[in-house]
């Protein structure tokens, strides 16, 4: 396997619409238990639940239509997103370390063979390694922000980039 293809529990669970739905349900349940007489949270939760369900459906449909099987990203921040939508995340760095020359060569060779068109990186990490790989395989490098305050917009944009031809 390629470097960084293993799941890492510490990665950004909130990048997955499915996980966001679970997080929202758990938060709502905790609030409801803490304030059992309050009904004002229910309407907000129901709106959020509906929005997240639509995001989940939209994400799944885009990925299914695209035929994409995996994507390359500098830091493995999309582990739960990949897991929940049947994708494989190939991370350039592993455990906070730059790849070895051998690992980098393997990523480049596989990306060339598969015709990878985009490599993703987060603005919290250096883009230099991503730029080198992208140039080498004639792909574009795309910035994503898994910490964006607009999680729904960020997930939509990320999905569009991952599934674009």
Residue ranges of predicted features:
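Extracytoplasmic metal-acquisition and chelation regions
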Residues: 5-165
